[in-house]
């Protein structure tokens, strides 16, 4: 993907932080801008813990295209920056290869 531009992130911070597991009702109430994968509403990112979870589970997400992974990576980068999380990865294909 070197030289290719990543899509613009769609993730936006929400007015609240949800610590811990989200209930189905809470997850259903989120807008698509809260998710790493907006179309499939996978990997909600409402706080730093959920952003780290999205990073850790990235390769486990099924039923998405490489273009959707590009967007999800952009969304994760934006959310990580917002919550003060440092990312070593510069491309989604690196997830799972640099973490100890």
Residues of each region from the PLM?
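A charge-rich, low-complexity, intrinsically flexible signal that marks solvent-exposed coils, linkers
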Residues: 2-100
């Amino acid at each position: 993907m070197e030289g290719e531009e990543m899509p613009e992130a769609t993730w936006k911070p929400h007015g609240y932080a949800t610590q811990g597991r989200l209930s189905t009702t809470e997850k259903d109430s989120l807008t698509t801008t809260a998710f790493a994968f907006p179309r499939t509403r996978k990997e909600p990112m409402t706080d730093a813990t959920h952003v780290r979870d999205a990073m850790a589970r990235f390769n486990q997400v099924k039923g998405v295209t490489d273009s959707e992974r590009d967007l999800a990576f952009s969304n994760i980068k934006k959310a990580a920056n917002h919550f003060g999380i440092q990312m070593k990865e510069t491309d989604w294909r690196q997830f799972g290869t640099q973490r100890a």
